[in-house]
UniProtKB/Swiss-Prot annotation:
Name under which the protein is recorded: Large ribosomal subunit protein uL6
Quaternary structure annotation from Swiss-Prot or TrEMBL: Part of the 50S ribosomal subunit.
MF terms in GO: rRNA binding; structural constituent of ribosome
Gene name linked to the record: rplF
GO process annotations (BP): cytoplasmic translation
Family as reported in the entry's similarity comment: Belongs to the universal ribosomal protein uL6 family.
Lineage: Bacteria, Pseudomonadati, Pseudomonadota, Betaproteobacteria, Burkholderiales
Keyword check for Transferase: no
Signal peptide: none
InterPro entries tied to this protein: Ribosomal_uL6-like, Ribosomal_uL6-like_a/b-dom_sf, Ribosomal_uL6_a/b-dom, Ribosomal_uL6_bac-type, Ribosomal_uL6_CS
This protein's record includes keyword Nucleotide-binding: no
Length: 177
């Protein structure tokens, strides 16, 4: 069993967990998430604490225990506090505007980019050059942030483009004669 898989998950108040065989459902103030666990691992719930249990002694079960624990923990955190990714737009004329279920981006192309947000993900634009993507599903929030960044990823000479707030862009030196 992996070290991550051995550590228990504490379930905060406001989160309900129902285990039906390999299907795990977590309900909280920010929504409901479900996940099917690998057949070699299971979950045991007692006194508001979840632990991962191995269904067999195969090496695969030990490897899957850490993955299962991390996924269920992300579900618990997602429905109680949620996840967010912050993006910043660097460049002249680069702007973003959140309009309901869509995100309008001006990234130096001849046309505006309209990005339709998936269900369960929200976007905010506190300023024109800042985007905050929020949601309860960690994978989905990261996927949306990566797709928005892919429209104009930071270029290596001036650093212009869409970048994560905590991202460090290493700039190349220009060619010398």
């Amino acid at each position: 069993m992996s070290r991550v898989g051995k550590s228990p998950i504490t379930v905060p108040k406001g989160a309900e967990i129902s285990i039906n065989g390999a299907n795990v459902t977590v309900k909280g103030p920010l929504g409901t998430l479900t996940h099917n666990l690998h057949p070699s691992v299971g979950l045991k719930q007692e006194d508001g604490v979840l632990t991962v249990v191995l269904n067999n002694d195969s090496p695969e079960a030990g490897a899957q225990s850490g993955t299962a624990r991390a996924l269920v923990n992300n579900m618990v955190v997602g429905v109680t506090t949620g996840f967010e990714r912050k993006l910043s737009l660097v460049g002249v004329g680069y702007r973003a505007a959140a309009q309901g279920e869509t995100l309008k981006l001006q990234l130096g192309f001849s046309h505006d980019i309209i990005y339709n947000l998936p269900k369960g993900v929200k976007a905010e634009t506190p300023t024109q050059t800042e985007i905050i993507i929020k949601g309860s599903n960690k994978q989905q929030v990261g996927q949306v942030a990566a797709e928005v960044r892919a429209y104009r990823s930071p270029e290596p000479y001036k650093g212009k483009g869409v970048r994560y707030v905590d991202e460090v862009v290493h700039l190349k030196e220009t060619k010398k004669k």
